[in-house]
Amino acid sequence: MPKVSEDHLAARRRQILDGARRCFAEYGYDKATVRRLEQAIGMSRGAIFHHFRDKDALFFALAREDTERMAAVASREGLIGVMRDMLAAPDQFDWLATRLEIARKLRNDPDFSRGWAERSAELAAATTDRLRRQKQANRVRDDVPSDVLRCYLDLVLDGLLARLASGEDPQRLAAVLDLVENSVRRS
């Protein structure tokens, strides 16, 4: 059997992830069946699951990519910066509109819940660290505990995703983010 190059494997993996992102965005997590994933990706289930153990692993790979990117932005610009990136390029985050399905699955599937918690920890850590640095620099309110501020920003993120998914005007949402940012800044 001919040896497949690392570049070829990486390109196939990228094709799988890009197709899966589109499929999850269009159908949501639960309705993104293996057949729909095959159609969106343009590969057989054997080819897809050669690279990813199962649908959860594929979904978590997307979550890992986005979490790493979001954590890097959150470290530099805070969670508000992440949300501004989402408004600037909503098509890059449209699959995250599945968060309502994810919330239900988190309550009912312990394995999924553990996997999701692992993927979310990096973004939470970056946000917490950014808030700590901003408090030390006297830029963020000190009358509210950091964990409460992070929870507040997480709630705003969830709402932003829901509004983007329902077609809300990104400019209006940007104005809301200005309000949120001012609410956490030190006066």
Curated annotation (Swiss-Prot):
The stated induction of this gene product is: Negatively autoregulated.
Q: Which SUPFAM superfamilies match?
A: Homeodomain-like (SSF46689), Tetracyclin repressor-like, C-terminal domain (SSF48498)
Q: Which residues bind DNA?
A: 33-52
| GO MF annotations, alphabetized | DNA-binding transcription factor activity; transcription cis-regulatory region binding
Q: What happens on changing H50A?
A: Cannot bind DNA
Tell me the outcome of changing K55A: Cannot bind DNA
Q: Which InterPro entries match?
A: Homeodomain-like_sf, HTH-type_TetR-like_transc_reg, HTH_TetR, Tet_transcr_reg_TetR-rel_C_sf
GO BP annotations, alphabetical order: regulation of DNA-templated transcription
Q: Which UniProt keywords apply?
A: DNA-binding, Repressor, Transcription, Transcription regulation
All residue ranges annotated as the HTH tetR-type domain in the record: 10-70
Subunit composition?
Answer: Homodimer.
What is the additional note? Its association with indispensable iron homeostasis makes Rv1474c an attractive target for designing novel anti-mycobacterials.
Q: What is this protein called?
A: HTH-type transcriptional repressor Rv1474c
The scientific name of the source species is Mycobacterium tuberculosis (strain ATCC 25618 / H37Rv)
Q: What is the lineage of its organism?
A: Bacteria, Bacillati, Actinomycetota, Actinomycetes, Mycobacteriales
